[in-house]
């Protein structure tokens, strides 16, 4: 096998001499080869979908219906369960066949994508402009670029509407707030009021406000997808039909690397938002499948011991804790009755097992004395020992809890992975944006290939 370091190996217009990029620069060699770049992207999509299908089947094969999903390290089945497949009241899995079907469909799709990727990478035309002008492009062609942007927006809008149709017409989705501890239901009266939907965007991100992450009913979530899907589709049509205005032509850099940097920035934002969503939100990410949120596990612990000590005769309304504040109950800064002790910092928490015990002024003492249901006790005791605090050696739960289980919560995995990947994507955005701006300004030199040490070394073989 010849190496590229001695420059004799020609790769049909993809070698170092013709592109300025060595083999390890990956798709940079394909910047001007639209056909080969298509192959790389389709093959990449095939790898992604193959992972989804294979991992899906792996989780199905290892799934134990008697244990909660979050105790089994699952990250794909909780998403399918949230969409209402295979689950019944209380989030209990009653049928794993839909999960199997999902895995098989993804595997079949990945085979089609894989074949297309290999075809376009090896056999198809190097460039699409001559044979298929509709699919061809020049990076500098602003009109074509916004047309491609428009097509992408329409596809994203259709994706948002897929969730809407699932919730409205195809069996519904899982609602953790359904009475008695959660159930699958069809969403009937959507929230379409713009003041409600866009009100989320205007909220503070802090404390009890929580920006869009604070959404806690499915009507708002599905209604938001109606709005978002409509905006994406209308924006897509707009971008297909129009050319960029003068201010936009001046404001942006119009090159392949610039578009890459914009995409990386968008993905970084998505990653950071997803991190906060999966960490704090127990409506879009029901605790029955993903495990409790951190605040939820803490409040569940306070609730569990309130129940226990009340049974043992404690007067939970007036008992004092070691600091002189209420041991079980106290008041928040705004006057609501909240759980006392260290969990006071999580007094904003809203959870379906706790809300029935609230009155107009926070936790209702008479309900705490008379109305606590067994399912609420069971659920809080379970959540108390499954806090999303797993460490590297997988000792999950609160460290001092003797009943803690060996597990890392899927919330920990999903929040951490999306934060880390979002950060890497942001750094990639800065890198490629800097290079694209420098190239546009005309002073991007790159590495001086003539002085690169590796060129003077002997070939590997």
Curated annotation (Swiss-Prot):
Which keywords does this chain's UniProt record carry? Acetylation, Chlorophyll, Chloroplast, Chromophore, Manganese, Membrane, Metal-binding, Phosphoprotein, Photosynthesis, Photosystem II, Plastid, Thylakoid, Transmembrane, Transmembrane helix
Any binding details for the cofactor? Binds multiple chlorophylls and provides some of the ligands for the Ca-4Mn-5O cluster of the oxygen-evolving complex. It may also provide a ligand for a Cl- that is required for oxygen evolution. PSII binds additional chlorophylls, carotenoids and specific lipids.
What processes does the entry annotate via GO biological process terms? photosynthetic electron transport in photosystem II
Task: Fetch the Pfam families from UniProt.
Answer: PSII (PF00421)
Q: Which GO terms describe its molecular function?
A: chlorophyll binding; electron transporter, transferring electrons within the cyclic electron transport pathway of photosynthesis activity; metal ion binding
**Where do the annotations place [CaMn4O5] cluster binding?**
355
**Sites of the modification N-acetylthreonine?**
3
Membrane topology recorded in Swiss-Prot or TrEMBL: Multi-pass membrane protein
Q: Name one GO cellular component term.
A: chloroplast thylakoid membrane
Question: Which residues are propeptide?
Answer: 1-2
Q: Which residues does this entry mark as bearing Phosphothreonine?
A: 3
Q: Which residues cross the membrane?
A: 57-81, 122-143, 166-188, 243-263, 279-300, 435-459
Q: Which Gene3D superfamilies match?
A: photosystem ii from thermosynechococcus elongatus
Can you say where in the cell this protein is located?
Answer: Plastid, Chloroplast thylakoid membrane
Q: Which domain of life is it from?
A: Eukaryota
Q: Which family does it belong to?
A: Belongs to the PsbB/PsbC family. PsbC subfamily.
Description of how the protein assembles with itself and partners: PSII is composed of 1 copy each of membrane proteins PsbA, PsbB, PsbC, PsbD, PsbE, PsbF, PsbH, PsbI, PsbJ, PsbK, PsbL, PsbM, PsbT, PsbX, PsbY, PsbZ, Psb30/Ycf12, at least 3 peripheral proteins of the oxygen-evolving complex and a large number of cofactors. It forms dimeric complexes.
- Could you tell me what this protein does? One of the components of the core complex of photosystem II (PSII). It binds chlorophyll and helps catalyze the primary light-induced photochemical processes of PSII. PSII is a light-driven water:plastoquinone oxidoreductase, using light energy to abstract electrons from H(2)O, generating O(2) and a proton gradient subsequently used for ATP formation.
Name listed for the protein in its UniProt record: Photosystem II CP43 reaction center protein
The species this protein belongs to is Ceratophyllum demersum
């Amino acid at each position: 096998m010849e190496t590229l370091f001695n420059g004799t190996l020609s790769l049909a217009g993809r070698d170092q001499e013709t592109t300025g990029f060595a083999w390890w620069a990956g798709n940079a060699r394909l910047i001007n080869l639209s056909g080969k770049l298509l192959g790389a992207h389709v093959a990449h999509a095939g790898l992604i979908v193959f992972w989804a299908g294979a991992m899906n089947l792996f989780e199905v094969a290892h799934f134990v219906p008697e244990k909660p999903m979050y105790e089994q390290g699952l990250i794909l089945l909780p998403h399918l369960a949230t969409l209402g497949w295979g689950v019944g009241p209380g989030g209990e899995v009653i049928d794993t066949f839909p999960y199997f079907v999902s895995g098989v469909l993804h595997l079949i799709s990945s085979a089609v994508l894989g074949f297309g990727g290999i075809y376009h990478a090896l056999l198809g035309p190097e460039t699409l402009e001559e044979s298929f002008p509709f699919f061809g492009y020049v990076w500098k062609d602003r009109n074509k670029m916004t047309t491609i942007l428009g097509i992408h927006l329409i596809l994203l809008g259709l994706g948002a509407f897929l969730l809407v149709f699932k919730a409205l017409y195809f069996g519904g989705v899982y609602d953790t707030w359904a009475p008695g501890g959660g159930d699958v239901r069809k969403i009937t009266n959507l929230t379409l009021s713009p003041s409600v939907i866009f009100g989320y965007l205007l909220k503070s991100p802090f404390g009890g406000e929580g920006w869009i992450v604070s959404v806690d009913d499915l009507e708002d979530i599905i209604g938001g997808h109606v709005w978002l899907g409509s905006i994406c589709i209308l924006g897509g049509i707009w971008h297909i039909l129009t050319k960029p205005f003068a201010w936009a032509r001046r404001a942006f850099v119009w090159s392949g690397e610039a578009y890459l940097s914009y995409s990386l920035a968008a993905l970084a934002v998505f990653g950071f938002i997803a991190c906060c969503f999966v960490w704090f939100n127990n409506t879009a990410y029901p605790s029955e499948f993903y495990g409790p949120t951190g605040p939820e596990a803490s409040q569940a612990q306070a609730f569990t011991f309130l129940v226990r000590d009340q049974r043992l005769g404690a007067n939970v309304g007036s008992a004092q804790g070691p600091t002189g504040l209420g041991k079980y109950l106290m008041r928040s800064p705004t006057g609501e009755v909240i759980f006392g002790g260290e969990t006071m910092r999580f007094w904003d928490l809203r959870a379906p097992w706790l809300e029935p015990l609230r009155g107009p002024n926070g936790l209702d003492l008479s309900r705490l004395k008379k109305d606590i249901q067994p399912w609420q006790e069971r659920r809080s005791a379970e959540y108390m020992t499954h806090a999303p605090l797993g460490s590297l050696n997988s000792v999950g739960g609160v460290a001092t809890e003797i009943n803690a289980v060996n597990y890392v919560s899927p919330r920990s995995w999903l929040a951490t992975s999306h934060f880390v990947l979002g950060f890497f994507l942001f750094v990639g955005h800065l890198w490629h944006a800097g290079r694209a701006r420098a190239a546009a300004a005309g002073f991007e030199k790159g590495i001086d290939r003539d002085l690169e040490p590796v060129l003077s070394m002997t070939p590997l073989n």
